[in-house]
């Protein structure tokens, strides 16, 4: 991620947009509560400031949730979304950088604040939204659901850890320059944050909050995406590559050269394939591990303009297309597109509630 630059004119416009009034509601209240009691995908529509709900049994949009803050204003430019289940409760965490990141991670402004939104995934009610000192990339629950982790995207990089019940700040962790996505390994033993200006990944012990390793990767890493088999896949925007990290040893196992700017990387264990979105060309490329940390490209799937996030549910993969305002449903076995689902404007993050 390149250094954030000042742009006073844009900041003024965004300040006006943030002030646009709408129907007021308080934290924990919803204009009309939903009853999403079925397996669903939740898609964040950045420009629309909504969540599209896709019923997985029919692959159709069955509901739309407006994102409103406690003062009754639209929550502008939500980004990524994560789910946590505790017993029968399902909650969603949404990171809100407050600006359009669909073209890349440049253009932020000093003084820009971020936000975290916590939502009940069944009713659609916003449980809490709270402002952050600096813009963030995402917000994610800790593996046990007791904490919410989020980054601060500036040169004095930090990860903030909040209590998921009281929403009070518990810990501030110093990481590299301009951290972006915060993620956890599949086994929950380590947290990762990609430092775009440092070209590193910070590895954090979730219990002690100590940085236990700093891993050098390629240019402008954005997210370290978890996979089964003890690996993390890091998408490096500027070097147009994927770095493969070993969770146990913290070693950088090697680099997959893509020759396109990656938007997201997701590993499908059943097919033993790594899917990487190619936003520029509206495709997803898929790679197979040939052994010895050697990955070979096996094909491409045409999805839609500005392909971005990828998520798997059984036999199907789901890809958000920011430029097409759709979600593509892909048959994992045949790599054939099943359908395109129209959603809101500039869809970005996607997550499942099963």
How would you label these PLM feature ranges?
Residues 2-10:
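Bacterial N-terminal signal peptides that target proteins for export
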Residues 19-22:
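C-terminal motif of bacterial Sec signal peptides marking the signal peptidase cleavage site
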């Amino acid at each position: 991620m390149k250094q954030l630059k000042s742009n006073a004119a844009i900041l003024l416009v965004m300040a006006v947009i943030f002030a646009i009034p709408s129907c007021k509601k308080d934290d924990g209240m919803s204009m009309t509560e939903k009853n999403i009691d079925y397996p669903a995908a939740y898609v964040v529509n950045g420009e629309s400031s909504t969540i599209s709900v896709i019923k997985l049994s029919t692959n159709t949009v069955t509901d739309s949730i407006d994102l409103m803050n406690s003062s009754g204003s639209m929550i502008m430019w939500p980004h990524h979304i994560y789910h946590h289940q505790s017993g029968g409760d399902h909650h969603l965490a949404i990171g809100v950088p407050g600006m359009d990141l669909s073209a890349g991670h440049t253009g932020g402004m000093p003084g820009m604040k971020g936000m975290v939104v916590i939502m009940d995934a069944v009713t659609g009610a916003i449980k809490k939204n709270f402002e952050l000192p600096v813009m963030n990339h995402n917000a994610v629950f800790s593996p046990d659901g007791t904490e919410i982790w989020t980054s601060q995207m500036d040169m004095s990089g930090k990860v903030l850890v909040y209590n998921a019940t009281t929403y009070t700040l518990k810990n501030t962790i110093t990481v590299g320059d301009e951290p972006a996505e915060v993620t956890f390994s599949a086994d929950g033993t380590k947290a990762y944050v990609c430092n775009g200006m440092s070209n590193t990944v910070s590895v954090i012990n979730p219990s002690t909050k100590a940085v236990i390793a700093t891993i050098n990767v390629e240019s402008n890493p954005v997210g370290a995406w978890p996979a089964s088999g003890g690996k993390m896949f890091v998408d490096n925007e500027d070097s147009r590559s994927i770095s493969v990290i070993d969770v146990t040893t913290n070693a950088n196992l090697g680099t997959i050269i893509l020759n396109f700017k990656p938007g997201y990387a997701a590993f499908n264990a059943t097919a033993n394939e790594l899917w990487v979105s190619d936003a520029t060309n509206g495709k997803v490329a898929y790679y197979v591990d040939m052994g010895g940390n050697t990955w070979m490209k096996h094909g491409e799937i045409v999805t839609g303009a500005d392909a971005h996030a990828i998520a798997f549910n059984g036999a199907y993969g789901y890809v958000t297309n920011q430029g097409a305002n759709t979600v593509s449903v892909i048959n994992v076995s045949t790599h054939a597109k099943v359908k395109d689902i129209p959603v809101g404007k500039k869809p970005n993050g996607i997550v499942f509630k099963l």
